Amino acid sequence: MISFIRGTLVGSDSESALIEVNGIGYRVAMSYHALSSLGSKGDEVLVLTYLYVREDALVLYGFVDEEERSLFERLITVSGIGPKV
């Protein structure tokens, strides 16, 4: 599992952030709350992550603190609830 990513914020949209780490760009799906607290383009950021693995996709979800990530991990264990941000 990828526990966190520290790198440069390259950009973001309404659902995700693009973070560059040593020349590799990671697209991280995040909530509006998390995205709004990241900072500005070019800032160094630290994002806690959860790698969601399905047979047809790998999705990296990002969080601003451990409480938010723990809640996400508990919610996705409930039948019928998926990880969509």
What are these regions (language model features)?
Residues 1:
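Glycine/alanine-rich phosphate-binding loops at beta-alpha junctions
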Residues 4-6, 10-85:
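Long, highly charged, low-complexity intrinsically disordered interaction regions
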